[in-house]
Amino acid sequence: MSNCKYAGKIKEFIPKLTPTLHKGQCGRIGIIGGSAEYTGAPYFAAISALKLGADLVYVFCCKEAGPVIKSYSPELIVLPILDSGNVTEKIENWLTRLHALVIGPGLGTKPVNIIRLCNERSKLSVLPLIIDADGLRIVNDNLDLIKKYHGPVILTPNEVEFKRLSSKFSNTEAINVASSLNSVLIQKGSTDVITNGINFDEFDFTFDDVTITCETFGSNRRCGGQGDILSGCIATFVAWFELFKSNNTFIIPLSSVSCYGACAVTKTCSKLAFQKFGRSMTASDMIGCIHQSFTSLFGS
């Protein structure tokens, strides 16, 4: 088993596969994304969540993207409703079924303010939100929506997206941005910085506010889609955390453990795929390595 600093803690909330489980108990994930121009991003996020071990993944996309995403995989539940007239009502009916929601992959510039809907919906639900890619544009223009959201919010900016987001604040350090937005923030890079706003010198699992780093080495190949894979993996780990939390009293930090696990899996996928494909490695090659990556870090 590969060296993963927090493997023991992560394994505590990975659901064990038993004969008594029924479909949905290992996670129901939603992906908000997919437009006429971008169909790959929501697929990569969705299939990653599924391959990591979520039971059901729903993709809420625009009408033009629906048939394309469906053709990629028959295992995804694709709902092309984002550009329908009553999109808010239609999506709201699904929210209570989900354990985590990814907003942004391939969403494009279409002004679908799902975050506002989730904010209103939070009176009945504190659905965890993972916001990436085009979803971060919504955050930049609606910071108060994130600050006021009752449930967990995880932001996953790359270098350019982080500069754009942090420019809204006088202190541009990741820890301050996360604290100001009342969110978990993963500043992606060769070393991923994971913080929800308070820094401790040593990691302590009795605290829910920590800054840690994932130094797992991936590869030097920067193919498109890696961020989408990470978002999907985060969603599954967060869903497992929510399910674990609802059935157990042991408290572990969401920002540290679930996000760290997703970062480690994604980077290990990159490493394994690059070893096999080298410069020709693509995100699809990484998808094929999710199982091996997971088992090398956490066992079966």
Swiss-Prot record:
UniProt KW Protein transport keyword: no
Catalyzed reactions per annotation: (6S)-NADHX + ATP = ADP + phosphate + NADH + H(+); (6S)-NADPHX + ATP = ADP + phosphate + NADPH + H(+)
Domain YjeF C-terminal stretches: 6-297
One record GO biological process: metabolite repair
Molecular functions per Gene Ontology: ATP binding; ATP-dependent NAD(P)H-hydrate dehydratase activity
Keywords for the protein's UniProt record, in alphabetical order: ATP-binding, Lyase, NAD, NADP, Nucleotide-binding, Phosphoprotein
CDD domains named in the record: YXKO-related (cd01171)
EC code(s) of this entry: 4.2.1.93
Cofactor(s) in the UniProt record: Mg(2+)
First-tier enzyme category under EC: lyase
Binding annotation for ATP: 188-192, 218-227
Family matches, as InterPro entries: CARKD, Ribokinase-like
NCBIfam families noted in UniProt: yjeF_cterm
Task performed by this protein: Catalyzes the dehydration of the S-form of NAD(P)HX at the expense of ATP, which is converted to ADP. Together with NAD(P)HX epimerase, which catalyzes the epimerization of the S- and R-forms, the enzyme allows the repair of both epimers of NAD(P)HX, a damaged form of NAD(P)H that is a result of enzymatic or heat-dependent hydration.
Protein family (similarity comment): Belongs to the NnrD/CARKD family.
Protein name: ATP-dependent (S)-NAD(P)H-hydrate dehydratase
